[in-house]
Design a protein with these regions (language model features):
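Short, charged, surface-exposed loops that flank catalytic or proteolytic processing sites
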Residues: 196-198
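Conserved N-terminal catalytic core of the sugar/cofactor nucleotidyltransferase
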Residues: 2-5, 13-15, 19, 27, ...
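Active-site glycine-centered loops adjacent to acidic/histidine catalytic or metal-binding residues
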Residues: 9, 107, 134
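Short connector loops/turns at beta-strand edges and beta->alpha or beta->beta junctions
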Residues: 9-12, 186
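Short hydrophobic/aromatic segments of transmembrane alpha-helices and their interfaces
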Residues: 8, 16-17, 169-171
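Conserved core of the sugar-phosphate nucleotidyltransferase
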Residues: 111-194
Length: 198
């Protein structure tokens, strides 16, 4: 499994709140946020971190990432405002067409069973899957900074970033930040389509 973590965003809300470190390097419960994210995927070591070149130059981000995942590859890209899909396209040359891929956000935590998730998607021979949740979660009382999924019988119909499909967002599935693809070529094909639409 290749885990790709786009983490090249500026993190404007955190800067505005007074944080000095880039969001993935903020310490929560004695670990960086990015270490918590990596711990969501036990025994996985094939990582690509797509990072903002300024964060790599001006912080110890590279050393921290290499300490967490020594065999990881780090891709440095210029500051942009095109989002995580764009960032992942900058690592296409490191993705094999036939390997399984998870694209993971760099700034979340979740309680889940990774082994069960993998077993489920592999048994169903799913081309893709998104780990989602719904119901009351305290963070839902605030902003809509989540990707909401429209589904029918647990099959994804549509996903929308930062905007729920209905007025009752707590009854909708929201992505936790984990996107599974059975083949790397699916990542390349569909991420390119998204970028070409913009």
């Amino acid at each position: 499994m290749k885990i790709i973590v786009p983490m090249s965003g500026i993190g404007r809300r955190f800067i505005d709140a007074g944080y000095k470190d880039p969001k993935p390097l903020i310490i929560v419960d004695n670990k960086t946020i990015i270490e918590h994210v990596c711990n969501l995927f036990p025994k996985e070591n094939d990582y690509i971190f797509v990072c903002n070149e300024n964060h790599l130059k001006n912080t110890n981000m590279r050393a921290i990432l290499k300490k967490i995942k020594p065999r990881s590859k780090i891709v440095s890209i210029k500051t942009h405002k095109f989002g995580p899909v764009y960032a992942v396209t900058k690592a296409f040359n490191l993705i094999k067409d036939d390997e399984e891929v998870i694209v993971s956000y760099c700034d979340y935590g979740t309680k889940w069973n990774y082994s069960k998730f993998l077993k489920t998607v592999r048994n169903k021979k799913s081309d893709g899957a998104i780990a989602c949740y719904k119901g009351f979660h305290p963070h839902m009382l605030g902003s809509d900074n989540y990707a909401f999924a429209k589904e029918k019988n647990n099959w994804l119909i549509k996903i929308k970033e930062k905007e729920p499909f209905t007025k009752n967002k707590m009854q909708e599935f929201a992505s936790n930040g984990t996107y599974y693809f059975r083949k790397g070529k699916f990542v390349k094909k569909y991420f390119k389509k998204i970028i070409d639409k913009k």
